[in-house]
């Protein structure tokens, strides 16, 4: 159990180091208004905090820096909510104020804005396409044998693919098919489209389309689209601006991981509800052992739809990032309810 004096010194060391990226010595602490005790007392308390594992020495300075244990204690017990500037709140709310809420577009823009507001790397895992509902489908002929099928969902996701049009299917058949599909399938979840088409729509099409078998075969290929989440990054190179990562050898594996993107699918899937903070080696990926990852989920009711996360150095502005993520996830959740 830390004393009140030790708590104050630990919080002051971490706050100062987060802001300056410089090791903190007793002389620096003695100049702080909140620290009213002698330099000797400060040194003794710092020695105790170091022995307890909350701070540690660096090779290049006589000052101390927070350890992972120190950051964890800080996040769990010392962190105070930070009020965001009014202009930032307005900027974020404006993003979600559009009359037509397109989740894909919002997810992409959220990653960009968060990276700009924090100068860290922002990652947004969008909703699974399987949870989207079909808004409409278009089939646009390119020539006699090919066409582009354009599928639009209620979240604004647009999926297009080139399909082969059988010789036996004419343009009037295509037009009839599209009209029937939009009439019968609008509002149906993407994950249910295949069953809906082959249990109900095929019966309807039989009465309207000539060359029925060829049309159904083409239709089957049209709706074979990936239903997994999309991941969006903002500020992929922002880590290079952090003093901790000026050594390119140290940051190379992290940048490779960010650039490949795939590992973040597993990291961000199945997150617990609410704000989660992973510090240093608490992260499963070795490339992230000098980083902190703060994530938050957004959902509708009990259904978790996606994750918003910020990746930065362990010397991260935890309070500010958490406040930003809370605002973003709240706005995202409200937008999805529109």
Curated annotation (Swiss-Prot):
Domain of life: Bacteria
Record's keyword terms, sorted: Repressor, Stress response, Transcription, Transcription regulation
Family annotation (Gene3D superfamilies): 3.30.450.40, Heat-inducible transcription repressor hrca homolog, domain 3 (3.30.390.60), Winged helix-like DNA-binding domain superfamily/Winged helix DNA-binding domain (1.10.10.10)
A Pfam family this chain is assigned to: HrcA
GO MF annotation terms: DNA binding
Biological processes, Gene Ontology terms: negative regulation of DNA-templated transcription
Family to which the UniProt record says this protein belongs: Belongs to the HrcA family.
Function: Negative regulator of class I heat shock genes (grpE-dnaK-dnaJ and groELS operons). Prevents heat-shock induction of these operons.
PANTHER family in the record: HEAT-INDUCIBLE TRANSCRIPTION REPRESSOR HRCA
UniProt-recorded name of the protein: Heat-inducible transcription repressor HrcA
Native organism: Bacillus cereus (strain 03BB102)
Gene label: hrcA
């Amino acid at each position: 159990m830390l004393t009140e004096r030790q708590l104050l010194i630990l919080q002051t060391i971490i706050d100062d180091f987060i802001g300056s990226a410089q090791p903190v010595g007793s002389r620096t602490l003695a100049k702080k208004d909140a620290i009213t005790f002698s330099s000797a007392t400060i040194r003794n308390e710092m020695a105790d905090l170091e022995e307890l594992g909350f701070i540690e020495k660096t090779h290049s300075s006589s000052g101390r820096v927070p350890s992972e244990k120190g950051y964890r204690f800080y996040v769990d017990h010392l962190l105070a909510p930070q009020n965001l500037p009014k202009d930032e709140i307005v900027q974020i709310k404006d993003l979600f104020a559009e009359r037509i809420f397109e989740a894909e577009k919002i997810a992409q823009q959220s990653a960009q804005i968060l990276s700009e507001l924090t100068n860290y790397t922002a990652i947004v895992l969008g909703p699974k396409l399987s949870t989207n509902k079909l808004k409409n489908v278009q089939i646009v002929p390119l020539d006699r044998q090919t066409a582009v099928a354009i599928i639009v969902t209620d979240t604004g996701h647009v999926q297009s693919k080139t399909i082969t049009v059988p010789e036996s299917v004419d343009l009037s058949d295509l037009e009839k098919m599209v009209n029937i599909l939009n009439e019968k399938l609008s509002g149906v979840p993407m994950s249910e489209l295949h069953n809906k088409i082959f249990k109900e729509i095929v019966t309807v099409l039989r009465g309207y389309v000539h060359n029925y078998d060829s049309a159904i075969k083409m239709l089957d290929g049209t709706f074979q689209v990936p239903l997994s989440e999309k991941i969006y990054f903002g500020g992929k190179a922002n880590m290079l601006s952090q003093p901790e990562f000026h050594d390119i050898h140290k940051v190379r594996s992290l940048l490779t991981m960010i650039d490949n993107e795939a590992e973040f699918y597993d990291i961000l899937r199945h997150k617990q509800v609410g704000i989660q903070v992973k510090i240093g080696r608490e992260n499963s990926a070795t490339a992230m052992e000098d980083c902190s990852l703060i994530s938050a989920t957004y959902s509708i009711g009990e259904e978790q739809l996606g994750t918003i996360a910020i990746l930065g150095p362990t010397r991260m502005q935890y309070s500010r990032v958490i406040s930003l993520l809370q605002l973003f996830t709240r706005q995202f959740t409200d937008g999805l309810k529109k």
